[in-house]
């Protein structure tokens, strides 16, 4: 299986790993040589070791850019959230992490529940092409989405335009809430973002090898160890 997977690599002997640096829960720093550090880079490196090849990181500022690179066949695998729209260009394997998504609302907001937010006239700031943006684009019936580049951009838009809510991942929103007096994170979730490894559609051996790698890493507790190693315990959960 591994030999067949390696035969499908874009560059012999090297695994091109697409990394979304915009997810600060999964990419928490940068090494002296410029390589990204965090759970996602560690998963990419471990996958390369599983295949017996070198790892080569290609970093992007958003998950949408990772998907674009996969569509152009510039990467072998991408570590981003599984989402139906992205599955048009990426063949996703089983998820390895799960992160809940909800809303942040300003002080004095009458919005109390997830359902309250989807109402006529409600304006929601969101990180463009994030998994939860794609999810909300499919499911919201009344509220409108206002997009910005990355969560920092969406947070700035939320503040500057005095929008009604900010959509995002729970751990990041909890940090945002600390910087706004009276802001609240709405309890519950509208979705749980499934972080996964995706391959190109025409790489069946690579997908099979990644699936085998994921089964092994979850069974031996490797993913849980990475959560502890990178200081995000309690913010992320190992996917079932």
What feature does the model see in each segment?
Residues 1-81, 86:
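Extracytoplasmic small-molecule ligand-binding "clamshell" domains
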Residues 96, 105-123:
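Flexible hinge/capping segments at coil-to-helix
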Residues 1-7, 11, 131-148, 215-240:
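Ligand-binding clefts/hinges and TM-proximal coupling segments of bilobed small-molecule sensing domains
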Residues 27-33, 44-54, 93, 120, ...:
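Ligand-binding cleft/hinge of the Venus flytrap
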